[in-house]
Curated annotation (Swiss-Prot):
The gene is SMO2-2. It is a multi-pass membrane protein. Residues 113-247 form the Fatty acid hydroxylase domain. Together with SMO2-1, required during embryogenesis, probably by maintaining sterols and auxin homeostasis. It is found in: Endoplasmic reticulum membrane. GO terms for molecular function: C-4 methylsterol oxidase activity; iron ion binding. Requires a membrane-bound cytochrome b5 as an obligatory electron carrier from NAD(P)H to SMO. Belongs to the sterol desaturase family. It comes from Arabidopsis thaliana. Expressed in shoots, roots, siliques and flowers, and, slightly, in developing seeds. Its EC number is 1.14.18.11, 1.14.18.9. The lineage of its organism: Eukaryota, Viridiplantae, Streptophyta, Embryophyta, Tracheophyta. Keywords: Endoplasmic reticulum, Iron, Lipid biosynthesis, Lipid metabolism, Membrane, Monooxygenase, Oxidoreductase, Steroid biosynthesis, Steroid metabolism, Sterol biosynthesis, Sterol metabolism, Transmembrane, Transmembrane helix. The histidine box domains may contain the active site and/or be involved in metal ion binding. Its cofactor is Fe cation. This is Methylsterol monooxygenase 2-2.
Length: 266
């Protein structure tokens, strides 16, 4: 496996510059992972497949789904890509590299774990601030246009929010100056996590059924169903911040009622 990764990386660094890999390569990787993981949930919703695992019974119209995709492409090319280009000198100054030797798996794992921890902390407070009255009305309400989320709505947001909450994702790598392969792995994991959290389905194989403190779709779907500034469930990947500060009480109360059979799923 190591030799396969090294040979593949050797091809990339031989044929492309550091700038091309870090900027264009990162953008193409993000787009590929995001749309390949998110589009199937549109198909599931339209066809009604696996509907017994759907958290909400409501479906989005094809027009609403199309609007989301169109807006995403606009923002990805007009906000995300320029941001990647502009941040390249910063990451280089902080020590990011694409050259050999590749980092060990221990180093990669330690950095990824650090990124998750710091991203959860920064995202929680940033997200909670966005639910203040003025910011929710003028910025964050765009993301909440979809009360019944599907995978691609994970990145449907106001440009100001993209920049604001995007800081939570890049602050960890900016602090450590990782190898580009570590940054790519972090980006892939983060994209898959946020798509899953917005997918609208809670499957028997969902990570939240096996991984302690992992939020997942059921946790975040509750946040979207309540169109209020105090909806709670502000966490990103892991939910310990909501538990510590008591902002998941409504969700936990609802979950207890469901488990006791006192109410039906809506």
């Amino acid at each position: 496996m190591a030799s396969f990764v090294e040979s593949g990386w050797q091809y990339l660094v031989t044929h492309f510059s550091d700038f091309q890999l870090a900027c264009i390569g990162s953008f193409l990787l993000h787009e590929s992972v995001f749309f390949l993981s998110g589009l199937p949930f549109i198909f599931l919703e339209r066809q009604g497949f696996l509907s017994k695992y759907k958290i909400q019974t409501k479906n989005n119209t094809p027009a609403a789904q199309g609007k989301c995709i169109t807006r995403l492409l606009l923002y990805h090319f007009s906000v995300n890509l320029p941001l990647m280009l502009a941040s390249y000198p910063v990451f280089r100054a902080m020590g990011m590299r694409s050259s050999f030797p590749l980092p060990s798996w221990k180093e990669v794992s330690a950095q990824i774990l650090f990124y998750f921890i710091i991203e959860d902390f920064v995202f929680y407070w940033g997200h909670r601030i966005l639910h203040s009255k003025w910011l929710y009305k003028n910025v964050h309400s765009v993301h909440h246009e979809y009360a019944t989320p599907f995978g691609l709505t994970s990145e449907y947001a106001h440009p100001a929010e993209i920049l604001f909450l995007g800081f939570a994702t890049i602050v960890g790598p900016a602090l450590t100056g990782p190898h580009l392969i570590t940054l790519w792995l972090w980006m892939v994991l983060r994209v898959l996590e946020t798509v899953e959290a917005h997918c609208g389905y809670h499957f028997p194989w969902s990570l939240s059924n096996f991984l302690p403190l992992y939020g997942g779709a059921d946790f975040h779907d509750y946040h979207h169903r309540l169109l209020y500034t105090k909806s709670g469930n502000y966490s990103s990947t892991f939910v310990y911040m909501d538990w510590i500060f008591g902002t998941d009480k409504g969700y936990r109360r609802l979950k207890t009622l469901k488990e006791n059979g006192d109410m039906k799923q809506t």
